[in-house]
Amino acid sequence: MGHLDLAALREEYARAGLDEADLAPDPIAMFDRWMGEAHDAIRHDANAMVLSTVGPDLAPSSRMLLLKGVAEDGFVFFTNTASLKGHELAANPRCSLLFPWHPLERQVRVDGVAAPLPRADVEAYFASRPRASQLGAWASHQSEVVSGRAELEAAYAAAEVRYPDQVPTPEEWGGYVVRPEVVEFWQGRTGRLHDRLRYRRTPGGWVTERLAP
């Protein structure tokens, strides 16, 4: 079986444009607008994002996560802090988020610094999760090598027995807010002359710039 001819795969982007006059006063307000439109158009996992981090050896790593909140100071997500991403953020809190909204021919890139959320916020979110997800957090020592799926299923069954009622928040379960320094909004256009409008934080506030595609 031959390889798919990836070089021949092309799409023409012609859904919409993005002008400077379309921008909100700040990137959080602009993101809220685009996220709402993405949710209306996509529904399924419109809040999915790629989180990229860098370890002490300067090797990058990326993974898909779900955005769980947008605050005045940034973008909120939750995860196991003992995972690879947790260790890398502890060593270097600078990170990047990418929201790929293919049906809208849009993407948003966020570069910023991750800061841990208060424990009360973490526990409040964990308490809102479905019981199955709570038990899964106890069963999985994220990013560690396991002997097979049976080991995970046994750990899950043990967690069910251990916590027949309320499931407490694991100590290593945490959350972060990514405080943005740069937020770029990308809209596909015809002829590959895409619109790229960037918010950049300065001591005097946010400035907006158009970038060549």
Swiss-Prot record:
A molecular function GO annotation: FMN binding
An example Gene Ontology biological process: pyridoxine biosynthetic process
PROSITE patterns: PYRIDOX_OXIDASE
A Pfam family annotated for this UniProt entry: PNPOx_N
Residues reported to bind substrate: R10, E11, E12, Y13, K68, Y125, R129, S133, R192, L193, H194
Enzyme Commission identifier(s): 1.4.3.5
Pathway membership: Cofactor metabolism; pyridoxal 5'-phosphate salvage; pyridoxal 5'-phosphate from pyridoxamine 5'-phosphate: step 1/1; Cofactor metabolism; pyridoxal 5'-phosphate salvage; pyridoxal 5'-phosphate from pyridoxine 5'-phosphate: step 1/1
Subunit structure: Homodimer.
Functional description taken from the UniProt entry: Catalyzes the oxidation of either pyridoxine 5'-phosphate (PNP) or pyridoxamine 5'-phosphate (PMP) into pyridoxal 5'-phosphate (PLP).
Family label: Belongs to the pyridoxamine 5'-phosphate oxidase family.
Protein name: Pyridoxine/pyridoxamine 5'-phosphate oxidase
Organism from which the protein derives: Nocardioides sp. (strain ATCC BAA-499 / JS614)
Source species taxonomy: Bacteria, Bacillati, Actinomycetota, Actinomycetes, Propionibacteriales
Encoding gene per record: pdxH
